[in-house]
Design a protein with these regions (language model features):
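Catalytic cores of enzyme domains
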Residues: 14-45, 49-190
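Short, extreme N-terminal leader segments that mark the start of a protein/domain
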Residues: 1-20
Length: 190
């Protein structure tokens, strides 16, 4: 039997923790941040709102899982404007999380991986003209599901801010619907 936590622990992340499922509260204000265009992905891809579904859909989907894991990648920056350091940390996180999602989907086909930032599988998304090329591989972000990432981290026992001149990318993976995957019972990661 596979252990999803073990996969995450050995997946190249800096921090891994059990996800506090009660912290998964979709918030309208997070969706409003998406709609404001801060990341320029709202209404531009299948993995982001409005294409990824309503907050009600997100709440129902997340409530159907019993367990989850949080994974973080932390990067040290030269200064607050170290764009190369931010990009390198983001790429390291996205690569590690894509690998974790791939492995988890093999073990738990109906798991829900929620990444940091928008899906980047395709150079250009087909939204809204054509169907998604890879609907089974597509990754929505925690924010697309209305989650306030800092709150989810804190309620799950992880820091969100690691001090000056650092950047942290956080993703989560929800799993274990009723008898849907092969995961061992929760265990202490400390």
């Amino acid at each position: 039997m596979a252990d999803i936590y073990l996969l995450a622990e050995h997946g190249g992340f800096d921090r891994v923790a059990p996800l506090c499922m009660d912290a998964l509260i979709p918030r309208q204000e997070v969706r409003e941040m998406c709609a404001s265009g801060r990341c320029r992905r709202y209404d531009h891809c299948w993995s982001c709102p409005p294409a990824c579904g309503s907050l009600e859909h997100a709440a129902r989907q997340m409530a159907s899982y019993r367990r989850g894991v949080l994974a973080q990648t932390i990067g040290k920056l030269r200064d607050a404007f170290d764009y190369e350091g931010i990009e390198a940390t983001q790429q390291r996180h996205k690569s590690a999380f894509a690998a974790l999602a791939r492995q988890a989907r093999f073990l738990c086909p109906d798991c829900l991986p929620l990444t940091a930032g928008s899906c980047t599988l395709c150079y250009q998304c087909t939204w809204p003209d054509r169907p998604c090329r890879f609907p089974q591989k597509r990754l929505s972000s925690m924010e697309a599901y209305g989650l306030l990432v800092s709150d989810v981290c804190l309620r799950s026992g992880l820091q969100y801010n690691y001090g000056p001149d650092t950047i942290c990318f956080t993703s989560c993976l929800l799993f274990e619907k009723e008898s849907s995957c092969h995961a061992k019972p929760e265990r202490d990661l400390s």
